[in-house]
Amino acid sequence: MLELDLQRATDAATPDDAALRAWCELALRQRSADSEMTIRLVDEAEGRELNHTYRHKDYATNVLSFPADVPDELLDIPLLGDLVICVPVVEREAAEQGKSLQAHWAHLVIHGCLHLLGYDHIEDDEAEEMEALERELLAELGHPDPYADDENDSITH
């Protein structure tokens, strides 16, 4: 079971709780243990501040992942970590890349959850594995390959 804390720190339109939960559960289904995580939906100012504080980048990015660093045995429910998603960046990217907003949201939530599970895309082989899993999960939802046009790669971090 997934214990999901959803925090909306913006008045912008965002996917509903059920959609956010469904995307997380899809990405986390390989994990058999109960899990706890937070998704915080933020505006451009908070997104920029967090990206600057934690990554020393002076711009808002689409999704930030903060994996928990607490041993599972110390918790009642293992804490995966937190995702911070910058709503205006997601909206802007979807429009610029000609993607449906729903598909882009699903991609970024799944992408962030995979980071919480330890996936990464720094090395080419890691990126290939992570992107293949993202493609598979998004296809199950009926969404197109988010990497079909590499010039419009949606992951900016």
UniProtKB/Swiss-Prot annotation:
The record lists Zn(2+) as bound by H111, H115, H121
Q: Name one GO biological process term.
A: rRNA processing
Q: Does the keyword Magnesium apply?
A: no
Major subcellular location class? cytoplasm
Q: Does the keyword rRNA-binding apply?
A: no
Its Enzyme Commission number(s) read 3.1.-.-
Question: Which cellular compartments is it found in?
Answer: Cytoplasm
Q: Which GO terms describe its molecular function?
A: metalloendopeptidase activity; RNA endonuclease activity; zinc ion binding
User: Which keywords does this chain's UniProt record carry?
Assistant: Cytoplasm, Endonuclease, Hydrolase, Metal-binding, Nuclease, Ribosome biogenesis, rRNA processing, Zinc
Which terms in the GO cellular component ontology are assigned? cytoplasm
State the free-text cofactor note. Answer: Binds 1 zinc ion.
Family according to the record = Belongs to the endoribonuclease YbeY family.
What protein name applies here? Answer: Endoribonuclease YbeY
Q: Which organism is it from?
A: Pseudomonas putida (strain W619)
